[in-house]
């Protein structure tokens, strides 16, 4: 009798938890623009169709640093339940107690993630992988560039947009320039800074606004740095005028993590959303919509889509490992060298 009663109580508690997860309102904070449009269509709307009693509000922000600033100001009374932002910034939030650890029992998709998607100590894992690329005007740049080394071609002088630090694209450019210089960026970037300083006079802008893709299509630049996912969309929208190059020197991952805000008002629904976003279905849909590489290793992505991401076998073999937690320890130093020696030195 007591055993039956105990099982009945457990069943009631489980059903109550599921009901909470399937009702209420949550706010997801993530990037503005194309990301918001595509993520809403590929992930948020299908989630709400699956859980019709849950309303998901999308709060857009320009970049990860702004998101962290917003969460800091709301710390005593969080208005956001889930935040998607760059891992180098979310790691800071983890250390400050802004984000809560996830319960693996409530997020079973954690078991299906790529090892590199796992964030230490149980915090929010990677939900997307992107990577650094070069983009160019296929009508004006012939032959097409094949890597970072081609930016020193005199033909491109005054036509280049290279996003500098503190933009994390600048970190990626530093790592690749170090490889060109034959040095290990973990011990020295002297060679990289020298190469980038030499490139300086050829760079029209170190801060492409609104971005390099738009400036190329608007005939202001012919070559720029960028991120693959957005570049692939602009490639399609421009009917191939914007070319996308995976650099022959390799590339580095840009990682977005999905995080449960500590003290959020609807923790159960927030956890349910995180589980859905990491699941095979949502990962497949978003990869095939916007060409971010999936973090769920069991998501079955179409070959046509996967070959346009860093997750293809050929591209994965050329990726350069980068510990973004380590990056936080050298970021200010690298930024100062860019500012003093590369940007001011041209």
Where do the protein language model's features map onto the residues?
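Sec/Tat signal peptide C-region and signal peptidase I cleavage site
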Residues: 17-21
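Mature extracytoplasmic/periplasmic domains
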Residues: 261-319
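A bilobed periplasmic-binding-protein/Venus flytrap-type ligand-binding module shared by bacterial periplasmic
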Residues: 133-140, 176-179, 254-267, 285
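Conserved C-terminal helix/tail region of periplasmic/extracytoplasmic solute-binding proteins
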Residues: 316-346
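Extracytoplasmic ligand-binding site segments that recognize negatively charged/polar headgroups
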Residues: 30-40, 64, 79-80, 84-220
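A ligand-binding cleft/hinge motif common to bilobed small-molecule-binding domains
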Residues: 89-92, 217, 222-241
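Periplasmic-binding protein-like
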Residues: 130, 193-199, 238-262, 297-300
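Early extracytoplasmic/lumenal segment of secretory-pathway proteins
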Residues: 22-89
């Amino acid at each position: 009798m007591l055993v039956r009663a105990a099982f009945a109580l457990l069943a009631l508690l489980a059903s109550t938890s599921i009901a909470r997860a399937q009702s209420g309102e949550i706010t997801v904070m993530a990037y503005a623009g194309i990301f918001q449009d595509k993520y809403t269509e590929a992930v948020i709307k299908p989630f709400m169709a699956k859980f019709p009693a849950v309303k998901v509000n999308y709060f857009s922000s320009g970049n990860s640093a702004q998101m962290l600033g917003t969460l800091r100001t709301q710390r005593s009374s969080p208005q956001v339940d889930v935040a998607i932002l760059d891992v180098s910034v979310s790691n800071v939030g983890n250390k400050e107690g802004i984000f809560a650890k996830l319960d693996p029992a409530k997020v079973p998709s954690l078991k299906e993630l790529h090892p590199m998607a796992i964030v230490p100590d149980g915090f929010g894992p990677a939900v997307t992988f992107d990577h650094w690329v070069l983009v160019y005007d296929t009508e004006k740049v012939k032959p097409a560039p094949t890597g970072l080394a081609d930016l020193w071609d005199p033909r491109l002088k005054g036509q280049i947009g290279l996003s500098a630090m503190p933009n994390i694209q600048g970190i990626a450019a530093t790592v690749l320039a170090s490889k060109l210089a034959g040095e290990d960026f973990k011990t020295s970037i002297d060679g990289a800074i020298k190469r980038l300083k030499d490139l300086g006079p050829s760079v029209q802008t170190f801060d492409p606004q609104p971005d390099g893709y738009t400036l190329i299509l608007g005939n202001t630049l012919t070559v720029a740095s960028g991120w693959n996912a957005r570049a692939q969309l602009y490639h399609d929208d421009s009917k191939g005028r914007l070319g996308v190059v995976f650099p022959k020197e390799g590339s580095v991952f840009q990682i977005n993590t999905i995080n449960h805000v500590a003290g959020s008002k609807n923790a159960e629904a927030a956890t349910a959303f995180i589980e859905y976003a990491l699941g095979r279905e949502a990962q497949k849909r978003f990869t095939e919509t916007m060409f971010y590489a999936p973090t769920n290793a069991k998501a079955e992505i179409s070959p046509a889509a996967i070959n346009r991401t860093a997750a293809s076998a050929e591209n994965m073999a050329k990726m350069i490992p980068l510990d973004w937690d380590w990056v936080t320890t050298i970021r200010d130093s690298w930024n100062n060298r860019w500012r003093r020696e590369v940007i001011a030195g041209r």
